[in-house]
């Protein structure tokens, strides 16, 4: 596998304007960052955001397809630096340097689509380390025990796990589950409005029951749900679904999602979410099923 290419090219963005493209180009070197993303076959657009809450990195789509959309808030001072580039993997590691913080993001292509993922850990400095940092401790432990070849540790499927998007599935061949406890076509979700992955067969243990609707995608506890209904009885009609927050979940059979290739698990696997939620640059995420 090709060695990583270190690219210490810093992109300073000082008080980026949201008025005109010419003003934006005066305040930032967009050509440099476009070149770096182009090395992995991606398009990127850097522009000003009209409001601070709209600032950040996202994936957008236009008539030419998907592209990385980097928006800088009004009066925001931030420098972007590509600190590792892996054209062979179609991945790069991007750092956003602010006066009081540094946030790192893995940008790349996974199966069918481009993605951006906030990375936990201040010492991460390479694409390989970023991918490993996204593995939960239980997954890393399983990798050390079961995967001997280093190059196999970052694959989507190896002896330690099967990965689909942000979810890791770790085999638990010794698990037996009563048929009456098995759920069918069960969704698992990060809980922040993202599209659910659907599991053909699932079994869950523990966790906290929460009430979820489109207005409360992160879920409400029973007490919070009851208080809401007392304040607003019409909320009862908001198409609520009872789900479990942070339960231990096991799945087998088919797992499908519109953005990923369907996988088939022939034995029970423990479900674990990646560690993006621990990153300073990530939005709040929870585990709902």
Regions found by a protein language model. Give the residues of each.
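Short, Lys/Arg-enriched N-terminal segments with co-localized hydrophobic residues
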Residues: 5, 9-27
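Short Lys/Arg-enriched alpha/beta "domain-start" segment
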Residues: 28-87
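N-terminal accessory interaction module
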Residues: 65-125
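Acidic, aromatic-enriched beta-alpha/helix-loop junctions
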Residues: 71-86, 180-229
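Short acidic, Pro/Gly- and aromatic-enriched capping/linker segments at domain boundaries
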Residues: 138-163, 236-258
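Subunit-assembly interface segments of extracellular/virion macromolecular structures
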Residues: 167-169
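Short, surface-exposed, low-complexity cationic segments
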Residues: 173-202, 269-289
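Tight coil/turn sites that cap or link beta-strands
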Residues: 244-284
């Amino acid at each position: 596998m090709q060695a990583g290419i270190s690219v210490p090219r810093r992109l300073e963005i000082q008080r980026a304007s949201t008025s005109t493209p010419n003003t934006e180009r005066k305040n930032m070197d967009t050509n440099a960052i476009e070149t770096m993303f182009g090395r992995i076959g991606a398009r990127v657009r850097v522009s000003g955001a009209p409001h601070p809450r709209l600032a950040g990195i996202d994936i957008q789509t236009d008539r030419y397809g998907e592209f990385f959309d980097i928006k800088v808030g009004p009066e925001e001072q931030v420098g972007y630096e590509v600190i590792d580039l892996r054209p062979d993997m179609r991945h790069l590691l991007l750092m956003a340097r602010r006066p009081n913080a540094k946030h790192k993001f893995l940008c790349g292509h996974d199966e069918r689509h481009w993605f951006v993922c906030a990375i936990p850990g201040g010492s991460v400095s390479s694409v390989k380390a970023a991918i490993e940092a996204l593995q939960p401790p239980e997954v890393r432990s399983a990798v050390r025990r079961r995967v001997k070849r280093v190059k196999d540790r970052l694959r989507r499927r190896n002896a330690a796990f099967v990965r689909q998007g942000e979810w890791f599935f770790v085999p638990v061949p010794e698990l037996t589950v009563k048929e009456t406890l098995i759920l069918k076509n069960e969704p698992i979700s990060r809980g922040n409005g993202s599209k659910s992955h659907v599991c053909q067969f699932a079994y869950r243990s523990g966790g906290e029951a929460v009430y979820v609707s489109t207005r409360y995608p992160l879920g409400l506890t029973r007490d919070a749900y009851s208080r809401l209904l007392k304040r607003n009885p019409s909320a009862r009609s908001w198409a609520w679904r009872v789900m479990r927050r942070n339960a231990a979940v096991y799945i087998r059979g088919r797992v499908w999602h519109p953005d990923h290739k369907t996988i088939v698990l022939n034995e029970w696997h423990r479900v674990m979410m990646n560690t993006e939620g621990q990153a300073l640059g990530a939005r709040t995420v929870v585990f709902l099923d």
